[in-house]
Amino acid sequence: MFEGFMVNTWIVASIVAVIAGLVGFFVVLRGSAFVAHAVPSGAFAGAAGATLVGTSTLLGLGVFSVLGAIGIGWLGRRGRHDVATALALAFMLALGALFLSMTGEYAPEIDSLLFGEVLGISTTELLPTLALAAACVMAIAVLYRPLMLSSVLSEVAAARGIDVARIEVGFLLVVALATTMTVPVVGALLIFSLMIGPPAAARSFTSRPA
């Protein structure tokens, strides 16, 4: 239970639980559950592309998570947000399929991104996870007040001079950071559940946003 790899597992699992709950609170509050599904699922294209060029899958995952978040934010300004999210997801999944077909070989590290590898976290992988978690917490702390207001009353936030569109993009980037740190641990399928399930259950006990 307290062997080296299990200690890493306990630490990383605890960090993932905190970050998923923190980011998921705003995901549920903003009604952006589809985004929490699209960014992790579509980011596997980055891992596939990284495998194709022979670089770190974590780097590829992070790049495509950020690009996907920016794409959703950019398209969302020009039309319905759910349609923009669906288009970004379809595009990233198509790229992922293309990259996988170009590799011409089985890539187990890509498949593991669907379900995660919580027992396979090494000490060297622990440090990037801690850094990304700290970045998520700092970003939420900086954006907290305008993000909270724009999530609850976007018209009031805009009337007070808050750039709602910029806050939206900033929050999408936070989701991208959370995706980059959590998907290798618990997988793209489970992180969606962790971001949505507990915050949605918590909201059923109170009508107050915070």
Model-derived segments and spans:
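Membrane-interfacial amphipathic/re-entrant helices at transmembrane-helix boundaries
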Residues: 1-18
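Juxtamembrane/transmembrane-helix boundary motifs in multi-pass membrane proteins
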Residues: 4-8, 53-57, 77-81, 112, ...
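Hydrophobic alpha-helical segments embedded in the membrane of multi-pass proteins
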Residues: 18, 22, 40-44, 66-67, ...
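Helix-loop-helix "hairpin" substructures at the membrane interface of multi-pass membrane proteins
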Residues: 16, 125-198
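Transmembrane helix-bundle core of multi-pass membrane transporters
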Residues: 6-8, 78, 85-143, 170, ...
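Short loop segments and helix-boundary regions at transmembrane helix junctions
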Residues: 25-106, 202-210
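Hydrophobic core segments of alpha-helical transmembrane domains in multi-pass membrane transport
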Residues: 13, 17-21, 47, 66-70, ...
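Alpha-helical transmembrane segments of multi-pass integral membrane proteins
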Residues: 12-16, 60-61, 124
